[in-house]
Design a protein with these regions (language model features):
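Cap/lid and interdomain-hinge subdomains that line or gate substrate/regulatory clefts
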Residues: 1, 8-12, 21-50, 56-121
Length: 121
């Protein structure tokens, strides 16, 4: 994490591929990530913001991941997380959200994600 904080860039990624994790593995991994980010921030004196990016068809461990990140960040800091921004969209992959329904584009047709093969994954 310290290498990420030392980079010229203002942003770096921690790739977990946690969609394939069990619930227990997800909790452990996200606690470890926040802990390591906090240690690096404390050692460098830098502030940070964690952005949790998920799968474009909303598979995985939501809201568990963001709940763990929020809980761990608030344990280690005097500030509170105010909320979450959900923005399910991936144009290149044909993923769109319209009127609160998430769609997968098949050819020219938009199919609700819950009615696709992704829903059971």
């Amino acid at each position: 994490m310290k290498e990420g904080f030392a980079e010229k860039n203002k942003l770096f990624f921690v790739l977990t591929n946690s969609r394939g994790f069990t619930e227990e593995e997800t909790i452990k991994a996200h606690r470890e990530i926040v802990n390591n980010v906090q240690i690096a921030a404390d050692e460098t004196g830098m502030k940070y913001c964690i952005i949790n990016r998920s799968d474009s068809t909303l598979r995985g461990h939501f809201p568990l991941e963001t709940e763990i990140v929020k809980e761990e960040m608030e344990k280690r800091n005097s500030w509170k997380v105010d909320g979450e921004i959900l923005c399910p969209y991936f144009k290149e992959g044909g993923r769109f959200t319209l009127n609160n329904v998430h769609y997968v584009k098949y050819g020219e047709e938009l199919v609700p994600a819950g009615q696709t093969e992704f829903a059971g994954d």
